[in-house]
Amino acid sequence: MAPSEDDPGTGRRAHRRSEPPVRTATARHYLMCRPEHFTVSYEINPWMDANLPTDRDLAVAQWQGLHDLYVSLGHTVELIDPIPDLPDMVFAANGATVLDGVVHSAHFHHEERRGEGPAYLRWFEAHGYTTHVATEVNEGQGDILLVGGLLLAGTGFRTTLTAHAELQEVLGRAVVSLSLVDPHFYHLDTALTVLDGSEGRAEIAYFPAAFSPGSQRVLRRLFPDALTVGADDARALGLNAVSDGLHVVVSPQAVTYQAQLRERGFDPVPVDTSELLKGGGGAKCCTLELCTTSPGAAAAPSTAGPDDDHRNDAAA
């Protein structure tokens, strides 16, 4: 805490509020999928209502705004071509788990999304990544988040506990299993934001009620200074956010969460993805991070596949 001064009104020592740490943005590498085929034609989470019309042009425009924001912040964005009959392919975070050039494929719980895992795997194979085909049900970075050298892994609705063990064998990282108990938070990335994943200064935000009592205790032990978010912001999918260590791309509806972030020295950047929310996803769901843990690690072993993918180019 900063040095204190005498309070002339009381004679007591008055304490200044601790200044938040200086935050630094780190350039990131993302994979995204344009929502050209987005619609809600089935219901596999509480957010989806097949009777509610979707506006594909609006979904594309909102996605484009998210893409362009990443580019303006200095991040690299790769694109995977959307496939007809896979309307949820826009939610790229679910497509795989990627760490230091190694890819563990997604194996989806619901039949409607099973085609996405092989589609994303083909993209990574074409771009020179080392790939592993999952045998257990997992939904990529939707449920697997790298924080401070650990892999936080959600289970309860989609990804299985046996998938956690498989992932540990493939990536050689310690996995911490966390049980999700509220179907509105069916993926870990809907209930928890990685604000800073760096080893030695890892920082998260989460909604405690989305987790089992035991998992809440685990999170408190691992992250005693974590930011806890209230129900209103969580139910606006405010925690389905993307951080580069300084900027936090977040739902405009998560107003209190944005204020909490500012108090911690982060710069919240509201982005409207409300049309995509009809499918149950926000900014993080649309963003698969190609994670690296060291400067020498390969985020993108090959920057151009057979189709010479359009990096940072997603103009309508």
Segments (PLM) and residue ranges:
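The feature marks the mature, well-folded catalytic cores of soluble enzymes
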Residues: 2-316
